[in-house]
Amino acid sequence: MNITPCSIKTLKGLYDISGVEVGQHFYWQIGGFQIHAQVLITSWVVITILLGSVIIAVRNPQTIPTDGQNFFEYVLEFIRDLSKTQIGEEYGPWVPFIGTMFLFIFVSNWSGALLPWKIIELPHGELAAPTNDINTTVALALLTSAAYFYAGLSKKGLSYFEKYIKPTPILLPINILEDFTKPLSLSFRLFGNILADELVVVVLVSLVPLVVPIPVMFLGLFTSGIQALIFATLAAAYIGESMEGHH
């Protein structure tokens, strides 16, 4: 059987695609603990970008905002409207929390498409968006759960737990299960969408490295923004629900 060089090249390309792996991690050993270094490094980069942008934009605030200050005031107004719509008139104290969630997830998602993480080589695994890792999304979801429990308990006290037996005690197991499914759905939805988007781009770049991946990358940017909005909206809705009562 004759195997042409073209066939060998095609087979090699398919083999390279089949070698795309997930789940490879780079750890730091600190004392008796293993720290997931990839997530920490990329999260620090995202936090630095956010803090640096805010400091530069508002270092000299003007009565009539211009440029960066105007942009961040627009973002703040958007987050305030989102919080007020979902939480109600008592939204004020929760704007920083919802805003932090939205901005961190938004910049994290976009960093996976816009920052050249791949050029930084690690002993194991590779750098990617923080939200590309299940540890990050689970942590964000658990923070959201803690926030809506705190919101309900701070407003209603122990009577908050009456929601589990409303409208009838028969629904107690379902109402308890609902509180477990909320963080699960939040974390896996965000993780799955971001991971799938990055894998699709990697495979397309391996197949056709020039033009074809570009529309998919733009679609990924749009999807990343939508996922950040969905997470922040649901977080605010859960907080509002815990303060108002069971729906």
From Swiss-Prot:
Keywords: ATP synthesis, CF(0), Chloroplast, Hydrogen ion transport, Ion transport, Membrane, Plastid, Thylakoid, Transmembrane, Transmembrane helix, Transport. It is a multi-pass membrane protein. Disulfide bonds: none annotated. One of its GO terms (molecular function) is proton-transporting ATP synthase activity, rotational mechanism. It is found in: Plastid, Chloroplast thylakoid membrane. The chain crosses the membrane at residues 38-58, 95-115, 134-154, 199-219, 220-240. One of its GO terms (cellular component) is plasma membrane. InterPro entries: ATP_syn_F0_a_bact/chloroplast, ATP_synth_F0_asu, ATP_synth_F0_asu_AS, F0_ATP_A_sf. SUPFAM superfamilies: F1F0 ATP synthase subunit A (SSF81336). F-type ATPases have 2 components, CF(1) - the catalytic core - and CF(0) - the membrane proton channel. CF(1) has five subunits: alpha(3), beta(3), gamma(1), delta(1), epsilon(1). CF(0) has four main subunits: a, b, b' and c. NCBIfam families: ATP_synt_6_or_A. Belongs to the ATPase A chain family. Key component of the proton channel; it plays a direct role in the translocation of protons across the membrane. This is ATP synthase subunit a, chloroplastic. It comes from Zea mays. The gene is atpI.
